[in-house]
Amino acid sequence: MSWARTHLRSALSLAAVSARGATTEGAARRWLSAWPAPQEPGMEYQDAVRMLNTLQTNASYLEQVKRQRSDPQAQLEAMEVYLARSGLQVEDLNQLNIIHVTGTKGKGSTCAFTERILRSYGLKTGFFSSPHLVQVRERIRINGKPISPELFTKHFWRLYHQLEEFKDDSHVAMPAYFRFLTLMAFHVFLQEKVDLAVVEVGIGGAYDCTNIIRKPVVCGVSSLGMDHTSLLGDTVEKIAWQKGGIFKPGVPAFTVLQPEGPLAVLRDRAQQTSCPLYLCPPLEALEDGGLPLTLGLEGEHQRSNAALALQLAHCWLEQQDHQDIRELKVSRPSMRWQLPLAPVFHPTSHMRHGLRDTEWPGRTQVLRRGPLTWYLDGAHTTSSVQACVRWYCQSLQRSKHPSGGPEVYVLLFNSTGDRDSAALLKLLQPCQFDYAVFCPNLTEVSSTENADQQNFTVTLDQVLLRCLQHQQHWSCLSEKQASPDFLSSPSPEPGRPGSLQPALRPPHSTGTNSLVFSCISHALQWISQGRDPIFQAPSPPRSLLSHPTASSGASILREAGAIHVLVTGSLHLVGGVLKLLEPSLSQ
């Protein structure tokens, strides 16, 4: 048995025991013994992912985090040590011509737009993003495609062995999950000789492990809001300070229109860093007098992300003295805001095609499968859920209404971490769902599930308790909505976030019923009632709480002319749903 295989078994045994207090060592061994042996000469992809997952519970890393909490700068210093142990220096990253992007809402979509625009120029692109939806290799892309399982496996073990070989008494820990993937992305991009790399910040900016990048070509900040407050601060201004930490001396940076307070913080951070910061004009300004721009991603909020992406791509091409940009006519708007406005220009044909052809699964995505329509959006902050509700309601109003049978509206929701799920659910309440379904971000309740979907940082009891809390919040909101005071209050303004025309409610609805399931698979089986070809033979409903809704709702769903399902609250939840609805994504 190879060293790697032996080390993998030992690490996973420890991870299984430490992550699940009720799991015995014998059970962990039985779980491990069920794995198929890897094909020689190398380790298989799933083995690499299982080993990567052990870094989620790396005990020495957790101890390191406790020590570094009062000194966040030490986190960046530790990342530089890991980079050196892996065989790279910080200066090596300058070869990647990086576009570094942070933000609270839309940073992933902005990166996707930017990468697709530049790829349309024939450039070889690298793209590092998080989290993944179905497979962890989605986080590292070359020319828009996730790296192959073979390439992932090769680079994973090469990096793992390198870090093991060059550890010493003072640096014995392996980097944790996200740090390891960040290092791996840098190695992949350098070895694949990309022309540029689009790098999405993980959390925050100032102390994020991607911020060892010292000389990006350009930086971007998407819309700001409240998220990860325990790490970044409890006000938008504090969060803006963290996000502005990616600014570098002399490196152009762009942001979209923000509230006055956080915009002032970004301006001050830029001035302190000697970073030229520009405010993006709205997309309409770039369309003025020209053809309307078509976006590959749905939702009005994507226009802000597209405007930022155009400026990032334009600046990158300008810095590289690209022929297409030298001939582009631009105008410099007068200063009307706290910041100078970025140039206005008519997008080139390559830019237009890039915006039109952008794909970013799990964000304002619609899947139609027979009578079921799935609306997938990984919104997980108050501002992004507001945008999700607007998109969902607009999509419903454009949808065709069936001639036979009522329409049924279902919410599938989960929220994790320190996010205020009650606040998120309150924003979803006006959509007037018939059923609210809650489940953890687990595709199956089984220890043999795909390694890409495993999370060792929480226990099953913890995630189920969280779902029951979601259900309790929803029930309280439903009771309040049904109260005479609520019914007599003014209706939401048409077109406002959360506004849904009463005519869209099915005639049989008298209120929202809620259910909790132990995994995504059981939730989808109940919602689809065998009417989706993937779930033609559903097992009996497995609601955690006995509820007449399970049986009465099943008959209504079976007879419905159309079933509209909004899946939101967590990108991990959306990823699990996509994994089950589109099995090809796991191949």
Curated annotation (Swiss-Prot):
Xref: PROSITE patterns: FOLYLPOLYGLU_SYNT_1, FOLYLPOLYGLU_SYNT_2
Residue numbers binding Mg(2+) 2: 228
The UniProt record lists the keyword Metal-binding: yes
Pathway the protein contributes to: Cofactor biosynthesis; tetrahydrofolylpolyglutamate biosynthesis
Phosphoserine: residues carrying this PTM: 539
Transit peptide: 1-42
Annotated positions binding ATP: 106-109, 363, 377
Cofactor mode of binding and number, as noted: A monovalent cation.
Catalytic activity: (6S)-5,6,7,8-tetrahydrofolyl-(gamma-L-Glu)(n) + L-glutamate + ATP = (6S)-5,6,7,8-tetrahydrofolyl-(gamma-L-Glu)(n+1) + ADP + phosphate + H(+)
Broad class of enzyme this protein falls into: ligase
Protein residues bound to Mg(2+) 1: 130, 200
Cofactors demanded by this protein: a monovalent cation
InterPro entries on file: Folylpolyglutamate_synth (IPR001645), Folylpolyglutamate_synth_CS (IPR018109), Folylpolyglutamate_synth_euk (IPR023600), Mur-like_cat_sf (IPR036565), Mur_ligase_C_dom_sf (IPR036615)
Keywords for the protein's UniProt record, in alphabetical order: ATP-binding, Cytoplasm, Ligase, Magnesium, Membrane, Metal-binding, Mitochondrion, Mitochondrion inner membrane, Nucleotide-binding, One-carbon metabolism, Phosphoprotein, Transit peptide
Gene Ontology CC terms, in alphabetical order: cytosol; mitochondrial inner membrane; mitochondrial matrix
Function: Catalyzes conversion of folates to polyglutamate derivatives allowing concentration of folate compounds in the cell and the intracellular retention of these cofactors, which are important substrates for most of the folate-dependent enzymes that are involved in one-carbon transfer reactions involved in purine, pyrimidine and amino acid synthesis.
NCBIfam families according to UniProt: folC
Family: Belongs to the folylpolyglutamate synthase family.
Protein name, UniProt field: Folylpolyglutamate synthase, mitochondrial
Provenance organism: Cricetulus griseus
Lineage of the species this protein comes from: Eukaryota, Metazoa, Chordata, Craniata, Vertebrata
